[in-house]
Amino acid sequence: MANGEQTGADGLREKLITINRVAKVVQGGRQFGFTALTVVGDGEGRVGFGYGKAREVPAAIQKAMERARGGMRTVPLDGPTLRYPVTHFHGSSKVFMKPASPGTGIIAGGAMRAVFEVLGVQDVLAKSVGSRNPINVVRATVDGLASMDSPEAVAARRGKSVEEITG
């Protein structure tokens, strides 16, 4: 397993992306809390992310994992890579994702790499531009991946056969 990756009781891959300490200033001083950003995936095209907040780190991680499991989305993959290039925004974070030839590996940094690892993508070229805020990068990555359509879905929407669509 990759560094920081675990497998849950339900067989899903879990990955912790970031933990952040936050403070709320009150009359008597500061109250500290923690936030956690996690991704979970089945390694076969389903992925979800979660953001949890709590006074203690383990509780924040647990909340994030539960939210990630509850919001899993399906991504149509083409074997170990993506079907076609995708660009997606969230806030001022912009992500490019492009299919790669077999043996390339995951060429992506930071939060994007964790998403691809739990999703089951093995060969991809990806770049994040603009804001590198992990929450926005993960959201842009997952939304971009979920926005991809399979050839069957495109053919059905256009009222054509898959052969006509794929040429």
Curated annotation (Swiss-Prot):
Residues 12-75 form the S5 DRBM domain. GO terms for molecular function: rRNA binding; structural constituent of ribosome. It comes from the Bacteria. The keyword RNA-binding applies. GO terms for biological process: translation. The N-terminal domain interacts with the head of the 30S subunit; the C-terminal domain interacts with the body and contacts protein S4. The interaction surface between S4 and S5 is involved in control of translational fidelity. HAMAP family: Ribosomal_uS5_B. Belongs to the universal ribosomal protein uS5 family. This is Small ribosomal subunit protein uS5. It comes from Halorhodospira halophila (strain DSM 244 / SL1). The gene is rpsE.
